[in-house]
Amino acid sequence: MVKRRTVKYFLRRILALFVLCVPIYYLYTTVQRPPGYTKLKGSTRRKALIKKTFIESWTDYETYGWGKDEYYPIIKRGRNYLRKGMGWMIIDSLDTMMIMGLDEQVLRAREWVNNSLTWNQDDEEVSVFETTIRILGGLLSSYHLSQDKLYLDRAVDLADRLLAAYNTSTGLPRSNVNLGTRKSRKRTREYFVSTAESGTVQMELRYLSYLTGDPKYWITADKTMEVLLGDATWSHTGLVPITVNLITGAYVGRNIRLGSHGDSYYEYLLKQDLQLFSSGTVYRKAFDLSVDGIIEYLLNYTTPNHFAYIAELPGGLEHAQLPKMDHLVCFLPGTLMWGATNGTSLEAARTSKNWGTRQERDVKLAQELMRTCYEMYNMTATGLAPEIVFFDVDQTKNEIYSKRRDQHNLMRPETVESLFILYRITRDEIYREWGWNIFVSFLRYSRLPGRDAFTCLDSVESKKVKDQRDKTESFWFAETLKYLYLLFEDDFSILPLTNYTFNTEAHPFPNIENNMDLYTV
């Protein structure tokens, strides 16, 4: 016999469902979203949620890791690179807070910089490259945005200590320096240094000379580029190996790639020219030559979906491609688009007298590579990209795939950086949608359960909490959330790409006139 359900029974069920749903709805609208969120529209709503995510994640760091250079949110603990800390996390994140208008957080960070920060520590050597792009760059952009001389004073003190690393026969910097003793004692293996590290310090040094009127930083930057562009064995190809000998100035080996140890060298070829108001410098010529080399030697496509990718040449120009691409390479779509248009809208750029087949080619390639970089996210179980992907050239696997050892995600910024640049220049809403999908995936899988903390993942193919890696990188605050926030900024007069150039750590510098009369390259 079938039991009959009365009206009273159904009413009780509806009431129970209502009682269950109301608290969930309340939590979703008041806890997960910022106040007033429902009154906002479109991009403004999304920008507000990204800002709220920054506040929550930063508050977790302030609570459990304040002042530490590294932060491990699962164990709620931090670690310093030097005994008293370097301000790694705080200074790297400072200009993001300024851009988002987080006055209270900026004030607390400033108090730490004023009262606790000292470079006079001699217990360990630090990376010249990382310290330059994150801390020197962060201080300089924070000074520009606030006009607070504290940051400029700290920048001068830091840069003077970093200059000790450039005391080599070529002027190329050693990899590490002791900020306290102003010496480099760690022997670099056979004096080999990374091409990217040597070629990604110039924007910061030149801007500091511009601000202070002291030419020594600008001269130091020029000397490094004289060496990096001066090896005749490679200069005609536009592509260079990922290692250089700081004693002889010659490139070492034949390994060419746009991933680790190569990436930002090519990025700064363009950005050094943009920083000087696209004045037709030798750096622009070198960048254009490098793009030609990338297209001739590194560019390839999958079958049948025609995903563009930038391969590696571990054996040099005369050897076979390795169909492998680091997430780091996803800086390239934005760089190509920026280089083709000089930061103006694509519509306006196409009416310029300087527009031609080269610029159209670079725009097309930027859009193709952007599609590939987004697919690196779209193809995974979590919607987040692995650190490295491979491309199937034998048509035996998926067109884009990752190996287990490369499936970790560090919440890197390169893809959202390029999405921001492509949206600003093309106004194509697809780039906002892709960026939003990536942000939502961070919310779902990088957030710690029951916490407003975010951490890296061990595997983007696992949705399990146990596969969360205990580390919040400073570039989560300095770059990833900043670029996502700016992606949904409707006012393009804020940090316009025609007047600002972002360093490789997303610190915005205003473009400058070369009034130093030091342009020696």
Curated annotation (Swiss-Prot):
Q: Which InterPro entries match?
A: 6hp_glycosidase-like_sf (IPR012341), Glyco_hydro_47 (IPR001382), Glycosyl_Hydrolase_47 (IPR050749), Seven-hairpin_glycosidases (IPR036026)
Q: Which cysteines are joined by disulfide bonds?
A: 330-373
Record keywords: Calcium, Disulfide bond, Glycoprotein, Glycosidase, Hydrolase, Membrane, Metal-binding, Signal-anchor, Transmembrane, Transmembrane helix
**Its principal location?**
membrane
Instruction: Identify the glycosylated residues.
Output: 114, 167, 300, 342, 378, 499
Residue ranges that the UniProt entry lists as topological domain Cytoplasmic: 1-8
How is this protein annotated for GO cellular component?
Answer: cytoplasm; endoplasmic reticulum; endoplasmic reticulum membrane; membrane
Name the positions where Ca(2+) binds.
504
Family membership noted in the UniProt record: Belongs to the glycosyl hydrolase 47 family.
The protein's name: Endoplasmic reticulum mannosyl-oligosaccharide 1,2-alpha-mannosidase
